[in-house]
UniProtKB/Swiss-Prot annotation:
Organism of provenance: Gloeobacter violaceus (strain ATCC 29082 / PCC 7421)
Chain's gene name: ruvC
UniProt-recorded name of the protein: Crossover junction endodeoxyribonuclease RuvC
Broad class of where this protein is predominantly found: cytoplasm
Function: The RuvA-RuvB-RuvC complex processes Holliday junction (HJ) DNA during genetic recombination and DNA repair. Endonuclease that resolves HJ intermediates. Cleaves cruciform DNA by making single-stranded nicks across the HJ at symmetrical positions within the homologous arms, yielding a 5'-phosphate and a 3'-hydroxyl group; requires a central core of homology in the junction. The consensus cleavage sequence is 5'-(A/T)TT(C/G)-3'. Cleavage occurs on the 3'-side of the TT dinucleotide at the point of strand exchange.
Highest taxon in the source lineage: Bacteria
Name of a matching Pfam family: RuvC
Assembly information from the UniProt record: Homodimer which binds Holliday junction (HJ) DNA. The HJ becomes 2-fold symmetrical on binding to RuvC with unstacked arms; it has a different conformation from HJ DNA in complex with RuvA. In the full resolvosome a probable DNA-RuvA(4)-RuvB(12)-RuvC(2) complex forms which resolves the HJ.
Compartmental location: Cytoplasm
Length: 173
């Protein structure tokens, strides 16, 4: 039996990354599943949101997470930010319907937690995810790797402060 199962999510409308990790008291995290939910730009927006809902709802049903860790919105293009916010709303609706609490982290918070540098590049994050999860290769695509990084950050922030020092990636900096 696992101590905690975290569903990490990197929200998006075209591509939404997900990663499911199990955490035990003193053992390394275990990767249960990761991947992406993809929708086509040729599909009506409301149908894309419905597809995201169905796929994410299936993930909740299949994996029964104890916690959702999701990336906070990062403002860069107004139109894109609004559509990502709507996709996040769909994800948070699923979490609420399944009675699963959520935590959210900005991209710099995830980078800082995994590398000790809030401005780390994507490659450094992927290497940290690969190292912390004991993966032979870097997880692909990038959105799935980001979701695994968000799940790891969720676990780190769930730990009591004294326990954080024992986690190698998080004692950096």
């Amino acid at each position: 039996m696992c101590g905690m199962r975290i569903l990490g999510l990197d929200p998006g409308v075209a591509i939404l990354g997900y990663g499911v990790l199990d955490f035990f008291d003193s053992a390394p995290p275990v990767v249960c599943d990761y991947g992406i939910v993809q929708t086509s730009a040729k599909t009506a927006f409301e149908a894309r949101l419905a597809a995201i809902y169905e796929d994410i709802n299936s993930l909740f049903s299949a994996h029964k997470p104890d916690l959702v860790a999701i990336e906070k919105l990062f403002f860069y293009k107004m139109g894109n930010t609004i559509s990502v916010a709507q996709a996040r709303g769909v994800v948070l609706l699923c979490a609420a319907q399944h009675g699963v609490p959520y935590v959210e982290f900005s991209p710099p918070q995830v980078k800082l937690a995994l590398t000790g540098d809030g401005r780390a590049d994507k490659r450094a994050i992927q290497e940290a995810v690969q190292r912390e999860l004991g993966l032979i290769t870097m997880p692909k695509p990038d959105d799935a790797a980001d979701a695994l990084a968000i799940a790891l950050t969720g676990w780190f922030h769930h730990l009591p402060p004294a326990a954080r020092e024992a986690v190698p990636a998080y004692s950096v900096g």
